Amino acid sequence: VAYFSPTGGTKKAAEMLATMLSQNPEYIDLTRRKFRKQKQYFGNKDLLLAAAPVYGGQLPQLKEALFTNFKGDHTPCILMSAYGNRDFDDTLAQMKDILEARGFYCIGAIAPIIPHIYSEKLGADRPNAEDEKVFRQFAVTVKQRLEDGLEESLMIPGNPKPEPKTMKPVVHYFDETKCKGCQTCVQKCPTSAIDKDTYQIKEELCVGCLRCERVCPSGARSSDYESVKKYLED
């Protein structure tokens, strides 16, 4: 199970499905840059569950693009694009394109709803018990495809190579009076966008995932995303 999950929503959904597919799933946390840099190899007896959140209808735009460090050997894979109750748009198509170019074939794809990072309303408390039922049925279908030896890759809607979108701006705030200098935000940032000396965010590297805000133990970080929230909820 390989996932990118800055605030935990995608990870939760991926773990829920993974336990229905395997008794002992192994996890690769692509939220950590070092695991996006390391080559990851998979055999034809493996099954990869690749999970990513949807950012503006696409994969997050990272310097080390997700799943590009993977190498399969005619390895079956399941795609999961987790989104905040708007739309997954091109994300699954992107994932399929990236992984099939690297030795995988897609036997299943799912787009569960998770809490939206910019809205308390959208995707609240998801995945829930009803989602779990859907996951279980999906897992049964995937296992059957594997048992039947079906190796034909699924057709996935969307544009596999969309033009990168400019994300709506998020204004970040840092309160030096609350900061304890613990460096948690620096260490946990998935794109290394926070200066370790000044704690200021390098906007050109920031993907607006809000991980720094969520992991700060002293509440020194906050952000203004009201314009994004209003756009989403209206």
Predicted feature residues:
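Short, hydrophobic/glycine-enriched beta-strand segments
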Residues: V1-S5
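FMN-binding flavodoxin-like domain, especially the glycine-rich phosphate-binding loop
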Residues: T7-R32, Q38-P169, D224-D234
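A mid-sequence, solvent-exposed acidic-amphipathic segment
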Residues: L154-C182, V186-P190
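Iron-sulfur cluster-binding cysteine motifs and their immediate structural context
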Residues: F174, K180-I201, R211-V228
